[in-house]
């Protein structure tokens, strides 16, 4: 499993050769921002969601989008609180890959919430 911790502005530098094929699970944490400041625009990926765009560039890899709705400080801290566990949304088109990511989120202490496939869930995130 590969967790992609870069911002969307780093998409061009994804290690494509290492991540293609072989059924590797890639956790896409990015957003479509063209700059660190989201008010400066988004990458134009046409009708695709950002994760669908990433999936097209990584044939054979199993993409699961997660962590992109949280600031780093919320990910780094303990997600278990007196009020309950912090939620992390995830989405993907491969059921086994999603199950693996959900298990990892649970192990980290997060409450994992499945938003469906990359198309539907990606648009919600």
Feature annotation, model-predicted:
Residues 56-63, 69, 81-123:
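Internal alpha-helical scaffold of NAD(P)-dependent oxidoreductase catalytic cores
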Residues 1-25, 30-38:
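Rossmann-like NAD(P)-binding element
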Residues 36, 123-124:
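A short beta-to-alpha transition loop/helix N-cap that caps and shapes the active-site region
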Residues 3, 43, 90:
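Glycine- and other small-residue-rich loops at beta-strand/loop junctions that grip anionic moieties
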Residues 7-8, 48, 94-95:
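Alpha-helix N-cap/helix-start capping motif
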Residues 27-84, 102:
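Glycine-/Pro-rich loop/turn segments that contact NAD(P) or position catalytic residues
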Residues 18-20, 43-45, 107:
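Glycine-rich, phosphate-binding/catalytic loops in enzymes
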